[in-house]
Swiss-Prot record:
Entry GO terms, CC: cytoplasm
Reactions accelerated catalytically: 5-aminomethyl-2-thiouridine(34) in tRNA + S-adenosyl-L-methionine = 5-methylaminomethyl-2-thiouridine(34) in tRNA + S-adenosyl-L-homocysteine + H(+)
Pfam families: DAO, Methyltransf_30
Function: Catalyzes the last two steps in the biosynthesis of 5-methylaminomethyl-2-thiouridine (mnm(5)s(2)U) at the wobble position (U34) in tRNA. Catalyzes the FAD-dependent demodification of cmnm(5)s(2)U34 to nm(5)s(2)U34, followed by the transfer of a methyl group from S-adenosyl-L-methionine to nm(5)s(2)U34, to form mnm(5)s(2)U34.
Disulfide bridges in this chain: none
Location in or out of the cell: Cytoplasm
Residue ranges of coiled coil: none
GO molecular function, one term: flavin adenine dinucleotide binding
Name of the protein in its database record: tRNA 5-methylaminomethyl-2-thiouridine biosynthesis bifunctional protein MnmC
Length: 666
């Protein structure tokens, strides 16, 4: 199901005596005497954070999670970040989660943060990575993933509710291995912003908390005290900041019942399974395998990759100029949301990599309006792109020719932050880590579980991740996964003096890349159901014919220098398959009653194989979707709070096909 995207309404700021005032809530962001000192007193000291940080374990797998109800100027985050670096163990990681219904525009944010030069180092990094203010989740990483920020844009209750597995407080606590350690309840006054202090929100906060979780807020309102108490928190008295008489501190003590109307059957998640060691075995050394290996290694895991070929970055990941591009739409569906979230995150990841490695360019790409259907689709984006010009701009024939550097027959959609990346080189960079071992020349034909670890080719690990593309359903445990093979062939031609003027990737019925080493890569064929990467001259000619239609005024060389074919793996709904792998027979038995009512509450998590995960079926958009999917999966394996909303976890879950079959019947 899809519905129109509702754009974010940014904060309407009025500056009074050099202080930011919210016209939406008729309240001030911070007072003249407040700011850093108030944040330090209320949130840092109110949650006893410095003492708690100093007692944390000194390993990378340890994550301390802080959640905030109103991001505002970001000052609480920046101060927390600075103090974390000073007092927390060097290898520990901070995950900061926040939300804002009306976020500040970047220029307003810059002006607000100029008031605190002592936070300038952190401020500069936040401004650099400040996201396009589209609705939903934005995940930002700083300091090589030591500090992460999940910034949710939208209604606070809706955003935090999506972090729940099921919404039943008893089952939620059975399933949850990751909790918020400390809460910053920071929003405008309860009398002016009631939704941020509602009973329903505090019920969700309780479900995301454990007995050691603390809460702090500047408010001393009886409404807040009552709501926290009803949710299972014990209130502690504390003097307020400055002239304020009181503030509220609290700690979570016990679970209360949750509203039955808000429960969701947790068919997408499994019960916790003990992991004796932080060891992982990954089958497949393509982009998916290398990204998940990198994400786990950063968390202190020892990782082994088993690759069938003689090196990583082969097969479907062997494209030396893979194109990064989004799938923009004015409609909100799991597919369009996942594609947008993924593109924004991937773009941030690749920008950071390009600071250190010469493995591509992000100078933009052009999606040509090459037929009436594509033209109509692009025209439907006009209003969306007016609100978010950073995502793309519609250009006419003259503009498209100027942007690309060559004569083009039509206009199109210019994506300014996209471009191309060398996938094999990227794979090499990702696994350049002392915690990652690579074993090549090994085709895995069976997997075994010995009641403690997974065993593949006499190698044992507590966790097994199948990231082997089209071969992911070759095993007994995975043969229910509906993965289809799609063969694609790229053609490499000699560049000419005229064609070397091309500056950015062009996409239409096919696509062509700017010259690299005196040659252009042109592609790509699309053969559904073909699982062998055989090369053929017919596909070369097909690619050359498409190239002529993309830019007919250019004299392209017909001299084929090389060609390459790879097999893409895709699912029926073209979303990837990522997450814990269900036992098909047990799943059908437990959830059989969904056939008569797909929304029926069943108080059971998915029956999954212990510590067995799938990470495959990324299709032709792997460069775009793999970074976010693997970062989420690594967090799940490492017992961290999700960086994706529940609806998107369900959208990519390996269990979704079994559930659909139960509901729809054979």
């Amino acid at each position: 199901m899809s519905s129109p995207f509702v754009p974010i309404i940014t904060a309407d700021i009025d500056w009074r005596d050099d202080l930011p005032y919210s016209l939406q809530f008729d309240d001030i962001y911070y007072s003249a005497e407040g700011g850093i000192n108030q944040s330090l007193y209320v949130f840092i000291e109110g949650n006893n954070l410095i003492n708690r940080w100093q007692q944390l374990p000194t390993n990378e797998s340890n994550v301390f999670t802080i959640a905030e109800t109103g991001f505002g100027t970001g000052m609480n985050f920046l101060l927390t970040w600075k103090l974390w670096e000073k007092f927390a163990p060097q290898n520990a990681r901070l995950h900061y989660i926040s939300c804002d219904k009306h976020p500040l525009k970047k220029n307003d944010l810059i002006k607000c943060l100029q008031k605190w030069p002592e936070l300038s180092v952190q401020t500069e990094k936040l401004i650099e990575h400040y996201p396009v203010l589209t609705p939903g989740y934005h995940h930002l990483a700083f300091n090589n993933n030591q500090i992460t920020l999940t910034l949710m844009l939208g209604d606070v209750l809706e955003c935090y509710e999506q972090l729940l597995f099921c919404g039943d407080i008893n089952l939620e606590h059975q399933l949850r291995e990751s909790y918020v350690n400390a809460w910053y309840l920071d929003g405008f006054s309860p009398s002016k912003n009631q939704s941020m202090w509602s009973d329903n929100l505090f019920t969700v906060i309780a479900m995301l908390s454990k007995e050691s979780t603390t809460v702090a807020t500047y408010s001393a309102s009886s409404i807040v005290k009552t709501a926290l108490t009803n949710a299972g928190f014990v209130i502690e008295k504390r003097k307020g900041f400055g002239p304020k008489r009181h503030m509220i501190c609290a700690h979570y003590e016990k679970a209360y019942s949750s509203p039955k109307k808000n429960r969701h059957t947790p068919w997408h998640i499994n019960y916790p399974v003990t992991k004796d060691e932080r060891t992982a075995l990954i089958v497949g050394g393509g982009l998916a395998g290398c990204f998940i290996a990198n994400s786990l290694a950063k968390r202190g895991w020892e990782v082994t990759i088993l690759e069938e070929k003689e090196k990583v970055g082969c097969g479907g990941s062997a494209n030396q100029q893979a194109v990064l591009f989004p799938k923009l739409s004015t409609y909100k569906s799991p597919f369009t949301q996942f594609m947008l979230y993924s593109f924004l995150y991937a773009n941030d990841v690749y920008k950071e990599l390009l600071k250190h490695y010469d493995l591509g360019e992000l100078k933009g790409s052009l999606l040509l309006a090459h037929n009436e259907r594509e033209k109509a689709n692009q025209q439907s984006l006009i209003h969306w792109l007016e609100l978010y010009p950073e995502l793309g701009q519609l250009v006419d024939e003259k503009q498209s020719s100027e942007l690309s550097g060559i004569s083009l027959p039509c206009g199109g959609l210019f994506i300014p932050s996209s471009g191309w990346i060398n996938s094999p080189e990227l794979c090499d960079i990702l696994i350049d880590n002392k915690r990652i071992s690579l074993i090549t020349g090994n085709r895995v034909q069976s997997i075994n579980y010995n009641q403690k670890n997974w065993v593949v080719k006499d190698i044992e690990a507590s966790v097994l991740i199948l990231a082997n593309g089209q071969q992911v359903n070759y095993f007994h445990e995975t043969n229910h996964l509906p993965v289809k093979a799609i063969r694609g062939q790229m053609t490499t031609i000699q560049s000419t003096q005229e064609s070397t003027q091309l500056k950015i990737p062009l996409c239409a019925e096919g696509h062509v890349l700017p010259a690299l080493n005196n040659s252009h890569r042109v592609g790509a064929s699309y053969d559904i159901g073909t699982s062998e990467p055989e090369l053929n001259a017919l596909d070369d000619q097909l690619n050359l014919d498409r190239l002529k239609r993309i830019a007919p005024d250019i004299m392209w060389s017909q001299n084929v220098l090389d060609h390459w074919a790879g097999i893409r793996a895709a699912s029926p709904d073209y979303l990837p398959i990522v997450g814990p792998l269900p036992n098909a027979l047990e799943f059908k038995e437990i959830y059989s009653e969904l056939k008569s009512n797909s929304k029926r509450w069943i108080a059971e998590a998915a029956p999954c194989y212990p510590n067995l995960y799938v990470c495959a079926a990324f299709g032709s958009r792997g460069l775009t979707t793999i970074p976010l999917a693997t970062e989420w999966l690594a967090g799940l394996i490492n017992k961290e709070i999700s960086i994706l909303p529940r609806k998107l976890i369900q959208a990519i879950s390996p269990s979704r096909f079994l559930r659909k079959k139960i509901i729809q019947g054979p």
